[in-house]
């Protein structure tokens, strides 16, 4: 796989607080190769390792996007849910940022039924169909549509399970990771000092609590995806 320069700057990473891990009591020994030192009871991540894995992840998503592959970005912690949505929309990716519903990937046929229901209700709302119903029935359907928009709005155009899943928090998104493992879907996951790097295909050692850290990493990944998508569209047009 040809490597590109993704302009991964260590000073910028420090400014974003990517190097701050959890308190030393919370660590997972499997993260030892990615820890640089300990400072005042807090583990400090080795940003050289972070840069290495992030560059590898950017190469992967660039080449996948260059082949027209589809991506899903997952991050349901309230601190970063808006970042997940904005990054995914910018890179034309699918996303889940409110709650991972069990079976979202492993029970895809049921999810397809829900997405079809979502589309039907949305069409009915857009064409004034609710206005022709009794008030009580219309209110029930509007509530259903609101719930579907909240939880499935980021995947409403996803017609098949994704080719690659990007995950912002290993512990919070453990169900999503298990489903990806069961289906053999490659994952890229931010792993803090209390995580298990063996559970993901490309672990990115980084602070998974700070918005600035997640934003910086997402910006790099979505830029690489966008670059790959641009190449893909050019090749289709030629």
Curated annotation (Swiss-Prot):
Keywords: Chloroplast, Plastid, Ribonucleoprotein, Ribosomal protein. Disulfide bonds: none annotated. It is found in: Plastid, Chloroplast. SUPFAM superfamilies: Ribosomal protein S2. Its main location: plastid. GO terms for molecular function: structural constituent of ribosome. GO terms for biological process: translation. GO terms for cellular component: chloroplast; mitochondrial small ribosomal subunit. The keyword ATP-binding does not apply. It comes from the Eukaryota. The keyword Coiled coil does not apply. HAMAP family: Ribosomal_uS2_B. NCBIfam families: rpsB_bact (TIGR01011). Belongs to the universal ribosomal protein uS2 family. PANTHER family: 30S RIBOSOMAL PROTEIN S2 PROKARYOTIC AND ORGANELLAR (PTHR12534), SMALL RIBOSOMAL SUBUNIT PROTEIN US2M (PTHR12534:SF0). This is Small ribosomal subunit protein uS2c.
């Amino acid at each position: 796989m040809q490597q590109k320069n993704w302009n991964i700057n260590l000073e910028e990473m420090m400014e974003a607080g990517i190097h701050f891990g959890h308190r030393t009591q919370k660590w997972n020994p499997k993260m030892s190769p990615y820890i640089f030192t300990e400072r005042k009871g807090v583990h400090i991540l080795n940003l050289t390792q972070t840069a290495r894995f992030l560059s590898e992840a950017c190469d992967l998503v660039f080449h996948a996007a260059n082949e027209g592959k589809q991506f899903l970005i997952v991050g349901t912690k309230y601190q970063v849910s808006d970042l997940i949505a904005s990054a995914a929309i910018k890179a034309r990716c699918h996303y889940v940022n409110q709650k991972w519903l069990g079976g979202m990937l492993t029970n895809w046929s049921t999810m397809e039924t829900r997405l079809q229901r979502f589309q039907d209700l949305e069409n009915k709302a857009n064409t004034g169909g609710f206005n022709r119903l009794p008030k009580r029935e219309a209110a029930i359907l509007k509530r259903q549509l609101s719930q579907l928009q909240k939880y499935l709005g980021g995947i409403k155009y996803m017609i098949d399970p994704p080719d690659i899943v990007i995950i912002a928090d290993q512990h919070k998104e453990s169900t999503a990771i298990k489903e990806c493992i069961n289906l053999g879907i490659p994952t890229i996951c931010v792993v803090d000092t209390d995580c298990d790097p063996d559970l993901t295909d490309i672990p990115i050692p980084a602070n998974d609590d700070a918005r600035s850290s997640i934003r910086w990493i997402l910006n790099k990944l979505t830029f690489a995806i966008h670059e790959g998508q641009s190449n893909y569209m050019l090749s289709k047009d030629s």
